[in-house]
Every structure is written in structure tokens, then in C-alpha cells.
Amino acid sequence: MKLLTGNSNKNISQKISKFLKTKLVHSSIKKFSDGEIYIEINENIRGNSIFLIQSISSPANDNLMELLLCIDALKRSSAKNITAVIPYFGYARQDRKVAPRTSISAKLVSNLITKAGADRVVTVDLHAGQIQGFFDIPVDNLFATPIFSRHIKRNVKGKNLICVAPDVGGVERTRALARKLDLGIAIIDKRRPTPGKSQVMNVVGNVKNKTCIIVDDIIDSGGTIVNAAEALINRGAKEVHVYITHGVLSGEATEKIKKSKIKNLVITDTIDNSNKIKKAKNIEVLSICNLLGEAIKRISNSTSVSDLFK
């Protein structure tokens, strides 16, 4: 087993390498003057099982192309098999046609990864579980729920807690966390007039005098979560804690969160946000490297990955 990292999130790759006590494969990933990406594997990997770690995060197009070219380089270097470890699977939000004459980018990206030569994919909290079915190769979709539940038990005080889904699509994810914590759930009915903008309409469930725990897979511009927190406080919630797997945090998201009614936002390091959150005191990052490292170890040893979540 050998590990290779792309440029999208070297921090998490180094942590996984340390967890597995395995050095990263030496490689050169450069750009030509016209922006084309150049990949070279600088050591022999013939006959080895390779785990390539690369998130499809901003700049999404460059990081996607880098992922595909790395897979191609590994294939042409006679790797025995290639597992694409994609902590954040970009383009997953376009998983169906939401309007006439639109693309389904999640399916296209799945095809590209498969055609490039990947034998397996490992990712974390896919935006829609059915994306696993877009692939013709095995996909292990890991969950941040165990990491979040441990943090909540240690850090969120009080007995009157409730888990909150920020929209109807997040109910299953919220229910999974609520089961682990033995809590009830509430749901926010959200209407989105345009992409990137949201308006909270209604809260389904009693949140008065309760500590609310919002759970979701992605925070992008921050509008959905900030509006959700405000709606909960306006309906009598005591305080709002937010747990989100992928911190995209585009534009002025960190500023919105700093000024919002959110007591604290907890994200994972599937996306490298070290520069964005330096001044945001109410944003905390939990590392998901041990979960990914353990999954890689189990795949390499042909043992169960699903047992991690029992």
C-alpha cells in the first residue's frame, strides 16, 4: 500500500500518512505557463495498491483535472489498483436535473473518475447518497456522524437538546445523529429563490428553551445556516450549535458566521480552510484523518469498512 497526495489538501494527506505510518509517494505536480497541469510520479509504484488523496474543492476545476491526471499517471505507471480518496466530492450538488436543459455534473464526474482508471472511491458524506450508484466501481461513503456525536457529548452542555435539519433534504442525516445522541429532531422548511440565497419559512417542531444542534453536509455561502439559526432563536431556542462536514465557506461566509446568532460552527478538514478561519473565533475544525486512515487500512486489509459506523 502506498499513498499519493494531490495539491488540494496536503494537510489531511500528511495526517493520514502519519496515522498509517506510511510515507507519501514522491511526485511532481506543476503547471505549464498556459495553465495545463503536469503530473509525474517520481518513484517506482509498479504492482502497488495506491490510495490517491485529493478533494474536489476550490479551485474545483483545477483540482478535478489534477485528480484525473494523477489517476491516469498511476495507471500508466502500472499500479496494481487505484483508490481515489476524495474527502470532499465537488460537483455533487448537481445530482439531478432541477430545470430543463441542465447538466447532471455528479454523474459526469463519476464517469470521468471511472474512465480515468480508478478502481474504487472513498469519500465522506456525499451530498446525495444515490451518487454512489452513478459509479460502476465500488464507492465507500464514510460519515462524520461518529466524530460529531463524540464532540457534542463532550462540549455541548445541558439536557434540553434537539437536533435540527436545515432543510427537508437533510432529515436522514439529522436523524442519524439524533439516534446516536438519543435526541428528538426539528426541521426547517426552507425556500431558495436563487442559487446561493435562501429564506427560512417555517420551523417544524418545538425548539423553545432548547439548545439546537444543526447538522448538514455542506456550508457554502453560509446563508442557509445563518438564516436557520436566526429562525430558531426567534422561536425561543436557547442557543444554536452547528455541525457541518464540508466547510466550503465561499465569499463572505466566515464574516456572516462571526456576526450571526450561531454560538459555534464545527466543520471537518475535508477542505483546507486554514487561511479562511484564522480570525473566526466561533469556527472549530475537527480532523477526519483518523476515520479516513482507518478506512484505507481496512480496504487494504480487505476487512469491513461499515463496521466503523456500528
Where are the regions that the model predicts?
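PRPP-associated nucleotide enzymes
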Residues: 1-310
